[in-house]
Amino acid sequence: MESIHCNSLLNPNFSLNQRRRRINHAVLNRRDALLRSLNAVELRRSRTFSAVRTSNFSVTAAATDVGGRNSTDASVMTTAMSGVERGVRVGKSSSALEQLDIERGVCVPFRKYSPETVRSKVLESRGAVVSLVSRGVEIVWTLGLYWSTLTYDFLVGRDEEVVPFRARQLRNLLCNLGPSFIKAGQVLANRPDIIREDYMNELCILQDDVPPFPNEVAFNIIEEELGQPLENIFSKISSQTIAAASLGQVYRATLRATGEDVAIKVQRPQIEPIIYRDLFLFRTLASFLNGFSLQKLGCNAELIVDEFGEKLLEELDYTLEARNIEDFLENFKDDPTVKIPGVYKNLCGPRVLVMEWIDGIRCTDPQAIKDAGIDLNGFLTVGVSAALRQLLEFGLFHGDPHPGNIFAMQDGRIAYVDFGNVAVLSQQNKQILIDAVVHAVNEDYGEMANDFTRLGFLAKDTDVSPIVPALEAIWQNSAGKGLADFNFRSVTGQFNKLVYDFPIRIPERFSLVIRSLLTQEGICFTLKPDFKFLEVAYPYVAKRLLTDPNPALRERLIQVLFKDGVFQWKRLENLLSLAKENVAKMSSNPNLRVKRVESKLDLTDTIKDGARLFLLDEGIRRKLILALTEDSKLHVEELVDVYRLVEDEVDIPTLAMQVVQDLPNVFRDFVLSWSNSVLSDR
């Protein structure tokens, strides 16, 4: 029976509608599966497949159906499908999975993966022993030969000079071993805690493009999943795939009922038994190597396989990606700068996904973007802001934003496709990330090291004192270059070196985040080589700190403004200037003239909360009074400078009226605070 963690209902990352979807997911999946099975049986009885398709169904060539799309006009959808941390829990979780849940810090309402589930599925299948032995021999023989060549290179002293060749050899080897190993290679490309950097660089270009499987097979799968003939649903469908990958392939089609163009993802046939078999072998090998990996590499091999297995199995259920799309639609429903394609839930199943077709311009073609009349700087600003909102505001992050998945719309919006591979961050992890930013600003590297422990990069009992100087060196070296030379790739490269010197393990969710940020930064540099990522990122973060009513962010704002108990007037001025810059860039973006974008920095709630804190929090009140009178003088000049920054952003009469209206509540809270203080003194 499918199980639900009740705590998932309280997850603050998700809206009420999103929580409802998670509650009903298991029941609806069971119902839909039964309906699909019944419809498929009926379909097999009555279908005259080839005759109907020949007479009534229009299969068009991809070149004409796509409308002569060139290399710059885009909507190619890859099929890297990784759901968020969900699945059906079957059986008792292993200790590694329990550790995975603890480290993740998010609720897991559904789970398909557990070592016990994989073992039972594999061993209960027909011919399991023969299949496992033959596959095991193939894997051991292939990897053994490769390992022997590495050993020989080391013995003859040429191991360093042949690294480029061996790295390419490893990439080709993984491709030949099939989809599980292709996905494993993509994971390794983001794990400096497991392999060295030169091999990572080679695996970064690992593509899961593979020959497509026959159309007849794909169309049969679509009909089985949807429970009716194709010609009843689509008036035409491309005769060639738009994209083909290790787990599935994509077609373009037109809905018969509405005439809308859609993209159809179809999963490869009989891929699930292959994935389960390989995961069983991976987990078996990991159990043998776990002691070695813990001692020599400082990482838990079983935990790494469990993270990988959970994500990979979720890729096999396209209903999870449909739910991801709904979540992104919910998150960006009021954002006029972002386009998320709609999903046709009634036309989706575990092996088929139907979503809105996106017509856009490939995001790595600056000339095509300019020719379309799209302001390049405006598009980059929109893209960076959208990425930061996903990471710091929603906690639901697109994990694979490569050029085939991001497009520029004619109206200046940024469009995303392919939502299978997403990273989910809990509310706690989002707050820790903001803490890390605050600690970096305050140059508190000891607390920054503790943040890495809280995020799961370091074991809880790790002594962080040796790591603090290394973090300080990295940050000061990067920050000292200024915005002109600061970029994530250089910082990540320096951080990767720490992995080899300290027991640092990169959690899977953060490897996705890091890869995503690096990919998007690379897209920005492709469009504009002198683009300064932080010149857009800093204003967004400043605006978020100043305007977000979240109590946790209010606390972080106070930490930023006070250093060693001293109020930082310059930081407040910088934050205000940066936040105003963010609003100005968005409101003046020529791509968004017809969109509703805020034109002023709304500080009303911030000022009201500040007044409330001043009255109710004795510590804050004392600090602010000291800030105004420190060094035996009134800081009138600083106050005037701050006022000049906000005078155009704040409607003083309206704010005064709101403060007056709020006075009864503030006075009540003040009396309660005062009475509690008096009673506690007694």
From Swiss-Prot:
Disruption phenotype: High chlorophyll fluorescence and reduced non-photochemical quenching (NPQ) caused by defects in photosynthetic electron transport. Specifically deficient in the electron carrier plastoquinone, as well as in beta-carotene and the xanthophyll lutein, and defective in membrane antioxidant tocopherol metabolism. Altered plastoglobule protein composition.
Pfam families per UniProt: ABC1
Keywords from the named record: ATP-binding, Chloroplast, Kinase, Nucleotide-binding, Plastid, Stress response, Transferase, Transit peptide
Gene Ontology CC entries for this record: chloroplast; plasma membrane; plastoglobule
Catalytic activity: L-seryl-[protein] + ATP = O-phospho-L-seryl-[protein] + ADP + H(+); L-threonyl-[protein] + ATP = O-phospho-L-threonyl-[protein] + ADP + H(+)
Domain Protein kinase: 236-567
Organelle targeting sequence: 1-79
InterPro entries for the chain: ABC1_dom, Kinase-like_dom_sf, Prot_kinase_dom, UbiB_kinase
GO biological process: cellular response to nitrogen starvation; chlorophyll catabolic process; photosynthetic electron transport chain; plastoglobule organization; positive regulation of carotenoid biosynthetic process; positive regulation of chlorophyll biosynthetic process; regulation of anthocyanin biosynthetic process; regulation of photosynthesis
Gene3D superfamilies in UniProt: Transferase(Phosphotransferase) domain 1
Residues noted as binding ATP in the record, renumbered to the chain: I242, A243, A244, A245, S246, L247, G248, Q249, V250, K265
Active-site feature positions: D400
Tree of life domain: Eukaryota
Expression (tissue specificity): Expressed in all tissues (e.g. especially in leaves) at all developmental stages from seed germination to flowering, except in the root tips.
Enzyme class: transferase
A molecular function GO annotation: ATP binding
Cellular location(s): Plastid, Chloroplast, Plastoglobule; Plastid, Chloroplast
Quaternary structure and interacting proteins, as annotated: Interacts with ABC1K3 in plastoglobules (PG).
Primary role: Kinase that can phosphorylate the tocopherol cyclase VTE1, a key enzyme of tocopherol (vitamin E) metabolism and involved in the recycling of oxidated alpha-tocopherol quinone, possibly stabilizing it at plastoglobules. Also regulates plastoglobule protein composition. Prevents photodamage of chloroplasts under continuous red light, thus working in opposition to ABC1K3. Together with ABC1K1, contributes to plastoglobule (PG) function in prenyl-lipid metabolism, stress response, and thylakoid remodeling.
Family the entry assigns: Belongs to the protein kinase superfamily. ADCK protein kinase family.
Protein name: Protein ACTIVITY OF BC1 COMPLEX KINASE 1, chloroplastic
UniProt organism field: Arabidopsis thaliana (Mouse-ear cress)
